[in-house]
A protein has these predicted regions:
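Long, well-ordered core segments of solenoidal/helical folds
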Residues: 10-27, 66-83, 121-141, 188-204, ...
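Aromatic (Trp/Tyr) and acidic
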Residues: 1-5, 9, 38-58, 97-118, ...
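Short linear capping/connector segments at secondary-structure termini
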Residues: 30-36, 88-91, 147, 211-217
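C-terminal beta-rich recognition modules with glycine/proline-rich loops and embedded aromatic residues
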Residues: 123, 188, 253-261, 266-359, ...
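Solenoidal tandem-repeat scaffolds enriched in leucines and small polar residues
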Residues: 79, 83-86, 90-143, 148-156
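C-terminal beta-strand-rich structural cap/linker in extracellular carbohydrate-active enzymes
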Residues: 368-371, 383, 402-417, 423
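Asp-box/WD-like beta-propeller blade repeats and closely related beta-sheet repeat scaffolds
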Residues: 33-42, 49, 64-98
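Solvent-exposed beta-strand/loop surfaces of large extracellular or lumenal domains
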Residues: 378-403, 422-427
């Protein structure tokens, strides 16, 4: 996404050095022979394969593909058909084979690139192993059966490790691409439905201490180690898979929610560090502070992966044309059905504002469908083509499919419904949050300081002023006093005597973004809320730091 000679040289060197570690039998990994298949060995091999295949896709360097073949062949010899080893019984005991079985994804990808049947056979063998009882899972993992049977995610497989479980289903998506086995796609869809219903929180992620936890219902509670960044990134990757396979615009809605909230909220302002966990209340804490013994954690690696898939889903090709999934200032180029380049130049301040203007550039006029995503929350959407109102269907949660002969320099205007909504907590406990467009709002101690009480009479308990449809008249603040905050809002509230007050809130990504002790934030607030308890005591860095008695210092990678 940012090609340069320096980046090319860095990647080339990394791949050369990685391949140089390959042993004579094909193994690339960090475990001695006596420890193969244990703990995170196959998980590490999975990422070696993904890296080699990604490099091959980018460069067509056959040495990388051959190295990937040798890694896979060595694994097949150790844990494939006829090896006597059930791959679902390998790996760290706590996660019952989920990590090892997620190697399904690169094995299916390797088959796609080589057409060599042994890789397809191994992929199918991995899926069959899920049904076999083993020493780690006496009833077997049963991932497909439990997904289709709508088992609650936090009960699935006896080890509801969120990141690794979704990774297995990513592999199932790739296997579906080469087999067209409908059961595979149905299983993934059922899992997605269950995660949306039971686990994914308002910011577009889930998990507590890395496992599914019925988080959709529990999200307004003070949760220990909430929303692992690996879960955020993998949820986004799974949604990207399902967007490609189904064309369901709600997948793009979820990608957008995760991008603008959970993912960017986990990234430090300079981008050099990521959080391991990011709650909906408390403080921002870098991964190195949360796990000082790890430093370069899985979350520091995965955060950028979630970020870097964004150009891939922002504008996509379809069977009949192209789809615009993400609005904002951008230039994109995709192919039309006839193969000519379709350039879309978009001007917009979205998601700060809801107006989008796009220009279509084509070498020659062509008839095709341009799909415009209508977010599920945008109940009032207006579209114009060359200044004329579009008279087709504009339905929230779908695409507006504009089929016409497109000409060079055609203009598209979209006006999205940016009215803020009050969302009641799914638990029914009386908490509420505010969402404007895709942006989740939060209280921040820089805007509403922690306090012991309110001195102004008559009351100190406030609640959001919503209308009968749960909309609230939130106003964007121009030129806010805290420039480090991306979006600042004036939010109308009323006290228990009925008097109106204006409180300041900000976007979730900016909330707590000094990443320092004492900068506290909160998304869900009890209705009505007491200022003395707006920021829950002891829900700060302590809920996200696993060792030590004080908040650790973060290393500055910019220091020489």
């Amino acid at each position: 996404y940012a090609p340069s000679a320096e980046h090319r040289a860095t990647v080339d060197r990394a791949v050369r050095e990685l391949m140089a570690t390959q042993s004579a039998d094909g193994y690339i990994g960090t475990y001695p022979d006596s420890c193969h298949l244990g703990d995170w060995d196959i998980w590490g091999r999975k990422y070696v394969l993904l890296g080699l295949l990604a490099y091959y896709d980018q460069t067509k360097e056959t040495a990388a593909l051959e190295a990937a073949r040798r890694v896979a062949d060595h694994l097949i010899a150790e844990a494939g058909p006829g090896s006597g080893t059930n791959i679902a019984a390998t790996g760290w005991i706590g996660w019952k084979g989920l990590a090892s079985c997620s190697v399904l994804e690169p094995i299916a990808l390797l088959y796609q690139r080589t057409g060599e049947k042994r890789y397809l056979d191994f992929a199918r063998h991995i899926v069959r192993s899920w049904d076999e009882p083993n020493r780690l899972a006496p009833a077997g993992l049963r991932l497909i059966q439990e997904a289709i049977g709508e088992t609650a995610p936090w009960k699935m497989s006896g080890a509801p490790k969120a990141y690794e479980m979704m990774s297995c289903f990513e592999g199932l998506c790739e296997l579906y691409r080469v087999t067209a086995e409908p059961l595979y796609l149905e299983a993934v869809q059922r899992l997605v439905d269950a995660l949306v219903r039971d686990e994914i929180m308002i910011a577009g992620s889930g998990s507590v201490a890395e496992i599914w936890c019925h988080g959709a219902v529990r999200q307004s509670e003070p949760l220990y180690q909430g929303m692992e960044t690996c879960v955020t990134a993998t949820w986004m990757k799974l949604m990207y898979q399902m967007l490609r396979l189904t064309g369901d615009s709600r997948c793009a809605d979820r990608l957008e929610t995760s991008l603008y909230n959970a993912l960017l909220g986990a990234m430090s302002p300079r981008g050099e560090w990521w959080a391991y966990y990011s709650g909906l209340m408390g403080e921002r804490v870098h991964s190195h502070q949360q796990f000082p013994d790890v430093v370069m954690s899985c979350c520091v690696a995965n955060g950028p992966r979630g970020l870097m898939i964004t150009p891939s889903w922002a504008v996509m090709t379809t069977a009949d044309g192209a789809a615009i999934n993400l609005y904002g200032k951008m230039n994109s180029t995709v192919k039309t059905p006839s193969g000519q380049p379709l350039k879309i130049n978009m001007e917009s301040e979205y998601p700060v504002q809801g107006n989008v203007a796009a220009t279509v550039n084509l070498p020659q006029s062509e008839a095709f469908a341009l799909e415009l995503r209508i977010p599920q929350w945008s109940k009032r959407t207006a579209i114009k083509i060359n200044g004329e109102p579009y008279d087709g269907y504009i339905l929230p949660g779908t695409y507006a499919s504009i089929e016409r002969t497109w000409n060079d320099n055609d203009k598209i205007e979209v006006e999205l419904d940016m009215r803020a909504r009050v969302v009641d907590a799914p638990s029914g406990v009386g908490d509420a949050a505010i969402v404007r467009g895709p942006i989740v709002l939060a209280f921040d101690s820089r805007l509403i300081p922690r306090r012991d009480g309110v001195t102004e009479p008559p009351m100190y308990r406030y609640e959001f002023m919503r209308d009968t449809d749960n909309y609230i008249d939130v106003q964007l603040v121009e030129n806010p006093e805290t420039p480090a905050i991306w979006m600042t809002f004036d939010v109308p509230c009323k006290d228990e005597a009925g008097n109106k007050h204006i409180l300041r809130m900000c976007d979730y990504t900016s909330a707590g973004n000094t990443w320092q002790e004492g900068n506290i934030f909160r998304v869900w607030a009890q209705q009505p809320f007491d200022f003395r308890h707006l920021y829950t005591n002891n829900v700060d860095w302590r809920v996200n730091v696993t060792v030590g008695v004080g908040r650790p210092e973060i290393p500055d990678i910019y220091k020489k």
